[in-house]
From Swiss-Prot:
This is Tetraacyldisaccharide 4'-kinase. The gene is lpxK. GO terms for cellular component: plasma membrane. PANTHER family: TETRAACYLDISACCHARIDE 4'-KINASE (PTHR42724), TETRAACYLDISACCHARIDE 4'-KINASE, MITOCHONDRIAL-RELATED (PTHR42724:SF1). GO terms for biological process: lipid A biosynthetic process; lipopolysaccharide core region biosynthetic process. Belongs to the LpxK family. It catalyses: a lipid A disaccharide + ATP = a lipid IVA + ADP + H(+). The lineage of its organism: Bacteria, Pseudomonadati, Pseudomonadota, Gammaproteobacteria, Enterobacterales. ATP binds at T55, A56, G57, G58, N59, G60, K61, T62.
Length: 328
């Protein structure tokens, strides 16, 4: 239903307009206060890069963060990552992730980023505290990438990157809750790089698509072509589950059942195992897999995806960030 409201297919969005005007008024006032320096943003002693969205819902932001961190690491840059830690609840903040940190403590996306990149990752509702925690333990870090937080204006940033779903784009264009917008599309004029996941990119936008890898068994680490798996039940607890189901079909998999879950939904053995019957194979997203390691069964697999950016602009962006991190 919410997708139909946000896309404009359902007339119910008009009933939510008063709340959207209120949301826009409050969010605009907050940004204006920082722009006029009525409120002071905290500036880190190293460059900060924000990777965020203008809309609610999954746009492919986390794969972009992983891509960015890995690309900078390959260039010899020491990167730290901070996040709000949605879906997790730590005993205290800031929380610096370790090999023992669970998704219940830090949230699924920070744990995924930590496992994929081995970069220092910290979470806190106050992102400046997370930055301070990283720099205190890892003073050699040269640049901070913040996973989400475009609207977290109390943290000063040097570069802003926005990820857009190229198919859904901005829906009906209205602020939450009548539409998907956290900020209106005009905000793109001040963004340093706009990355478009799928669809047809417009002038000045960087095309991106998600490239699936081999399926990985949660219990054994065995890898295989996902098309070799039989009697598949697909599970996705991400911002936009249909994208994952479409990826499976693109890989030649026709799931017997597709199970969309809420983004950041907590998972347990009983609930997940109930999704599959004897002889079926469960295939989930990597974001779901980090929540299932402790209780995974032998017929549970996940499909990792990597962001693939096209054109000349990604190299220019990486050169800019490398120069920033190097102090040039």
């Amino acid at each position: 239903m919410i997708e139909k409201i946000w896309s404009g297919e359902s007339p119910l969005w008009r009933l939510l307009l008063p709340l959207s005007w209120l949301y826009g008024l409050v969010s605009g006032a907050i940004r204006l206060c920082y722009k006029l320096k009525l409120k002071r943003a905290w500036r880190a002693p190293v460059p900060v890069v924000v990777v965020g969205n203008l809309t609610a819902g999954g746009n492919g932001k986390t794969p972009v963060v992983v891509w960015l961190v890995e690309q900078l690491q390959q260039r010899g840059i020491r990167v730290g990552v901070v996040s709000r830690g949605y879906g997790g609840k730590a005993e205290s903040y800031p929380l610096l992730l370790s090999a023992d940190t669970t998704t219940a403590q830090a949230g699924d996306e920070p744990v995924l980023i930590y496992q994929r990149t081995d970069a220092p990752v910290a979470v806190s509702p106050v992102r400046s505290d997370a930055v301070k925690a990283i720099l205190a333990q890892h003073p050699d870090v040269q640049i901070i990438v913040t996973d989400d937080g475009l609207q977290h204006y109390c943290l000063a940033r040097d570069v802003e990157i926005v990820v857009i779903d190229g198919v859904r784009r901005f829906g009906n264009g209205w602020w939450l809750p009548a539409g998907p917008m956290r900020e209106r599309a005009g905000r793109l004029k001040s963004i340093d790089a706009v990355i478009v996941n799928g669809g047809v990119p417009r002038s000045g936008e960087i095309p991106m698509h998600l490239l699936p890898g081999q399926a990985v068994n949660l219990r054994t680490g065995t890898r295989c072509d996902v098309a070799q798996l039989e009697h598949v039940v697909a599970m996705a607890g991400i911002g936009h589950p249909p994208r994952f189901f479409a990826t499976l079909k693109m890989c030649g998999v026709q799931p017997e059942k597709c199970v969309p879950l809420a983004d950041h939904q907590s998972l347990n053995h009983a609930d997940v195992s109930a999704l599959v019957s004897t002889g079926q194979t469960l295939v989930m997203t990597e974001k779901d897999a980090v929540k299932c390691w402790a209780f995974a069964e032998e017929n549970w697999w996940y499909l990792p995806v990597d962001a693939q950016l096209s054109g000349d602009e990604p190299a220019k962006l990486l050169a800019q960030l490398t120069s920033l991190a190097s102090g040039n």
